[in-house]
A protein has these predicted regions:
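Charged, often Cys/His-bearing segments associated with DNA-binding zinc-finger transcription factors
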Residues: 1-40, 351-358
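Basic, short loop/linker segments at the boundary and entry of helix-turn-helix/winged-helix-like folds
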Residues: 16, 23-65, 69-70, 104
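Acidic, metal-coordinating catalytic cores used for nucleic-acid/nucleotide bond scission
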Residues: 51-55, 258-267, 285-287
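Polybasic low-complexity intrinsically disordered regions
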Residues: 75, 79-82, 92-96, 100-274
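Hydrophobic, well-ordered secondary-structure elements that form the walls
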Residues: 101, 260, 279, 310-312, ...
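Short, charged, surface-exposed secondary-structure boundary motifs
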Residues: 242, 267, 288-295
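Basic, amphipathic alpha-helical segments enriched in Lys/Arg and hydrophobic/aromatic residues
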Residues: 270, 297-358
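Short hydrophobic/aromatic-enriched beta-strand-loop microsegments
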Residues: 275-283
């Protein structure tokens, strides 16, 4: 690159900074180097013998965060890294130098998942939050959200084989290419949504149920700061209540736990009490009877607090455009863990800006 071109590039990057490059804010707020110890040693080259030297693992991890923020496919991510100067600067790649292709990005994410390093990085970032003073406090809120995947077109016999727990290779032994494209971990469920509406006589109108195929993201956030502290992934058909123990933490400064009525059961109430946690779970309406006024008022009060977790899912779906393109629950969990990390990083930027602004 000649001197004139280099000067023009420097001038262009300075203009990006002047107008407020959000990636510079992310770089200044999150200590990405802190994750290096969990990332070093992963196979993050292109996988070919005698091929190009491996890319820096921290740069590769930052690329996955960008991918989660924009919900890009691996192929599109390869293009965007080459296309955007601000992204290249954030990832520490040189203009005209080598950048990771889609296979390298996929292989790095798979190794990050298979080695368990991704979960350790999530915990390491939580430690980073605590070090900055964002400890879990004021109780925790639990909820789950459906995340769709591309629908599968299977015969009745194939559907039954999936329900029986058979692997894709067992169902399509003579069609390896087809088996590789089949997700046998995702499940169908009915998503009932919308505001409850009533007839003139006061009886509720039927709710709209929309069939959804995919996975379910279970999370808990701390009430004070709104960071995702615990998370789990299941198929879409898994019952919310059964995941309470997976996502409730005993490390919050308050023992209060908020959740909707799907989490209310004698078993869960007994377990919370055994952990010295106070249940703030919604009460269910008695079958065939009106909801007692006291219970209705208590539920309304709980809803005002519990609604905060809906902002997390809205952020991931509206800003990130969260949708899973990968196959299998292991890769789905990786995608959702990265989305949770990306959300927590955005949340940290929000709190840090508010602290500076007073």
């Amino acid at each position: 690159m000649d001197q004139r071109s280099l000067f023009g590039l420097t001038e262009h990057l300075e203009a990006l900074s002047k107008h407020g490059d959000p990636l510079e804010v992310l770089e200044a707020t999150v200590d990405f180097e802190h994750f290096r110890g969990w990332l070093v040693g992963l196979g993050y080259g292109d996988g070919s013998k005698g091929g190009r030297p491996p890319f820096d693992p921290v740069s590769m991890f930052k690329a996955l965060i960008l991918q989660a923020q924009h919900n890009l496919s691996d192929a599109r991510m390869e293009f965007m890294i080459r296309d955007r100067l601000s992204w290249m600067r954030f990832l520490n790649f040189d203009l005209g130098g080598p950048t990771p292709d889609e296979n390298t990005i996929r292989l790095f994410r798979d190794k990050l998942t298979e080695s368990g390093a991704l979960k350790r990085v999530m915990k390491a970032f939580d430690w980073q939050l605590r070090k900055k003073g964002y400890i879990p406090m004021a109780g925790q809120i639990v909820d789950a959200s459906l995340v769709p995947v591309p629908k599968q077109r299977n015969t009745d016999g194939e559907k039954q084989a999936v329900k029986d727990g058979k692997s894709a290779r067992e169902i399509w032994p003579d069609e390896p290419n087809k088996a590789a494209q089949k997700d046998v971990d995702a499940r169908w469920t009915l998503k009932v949504g919308g505001k409850v509406r009533y007839r003139p006589d006061g009886t509720p109108l039927p709710m709209i149920a929309v069939p959804t195929f995919g996975y379910k993201s279970h999370i808990s956030i701390d009430r004070r700061f709104g960071f995702i502290r615990e998370a789990a992934v299941t198929s879409a058909s898994a019952a919310d209540g059964r995941m309470l123990r997976r996502v409730v933490s005993t490390r919050n400064t308050s023992g209060e736990v908020w959740a909707d009525s799907a989490y209310r059961s004698q078993s869960n109430e007994k377990w919370l009490a055994s952990k010295m946690l106070a249940s703030r779970i919604h009460r269910r309406k008695p079958a065939g009877k009106p909801m007692p006024q006291a219970a209705a008022r208590a539920n309304a009060k709980k809803s005002s607090i519990r609604a905060r977790i809906e902002h997390v899912f809205a952020h991931q779906k509206n800003r990130f455009g969260l949708f899973i393109r990968t196959i299998g629950i292991a890769r789905a969990e990786a995608k959702l863990t990265l989305a949770n990390l990306a959300y927590n990083m955005d949340r940290l930027i929000f709190h840090e800006r508010r602290a500076v602004g007073g």
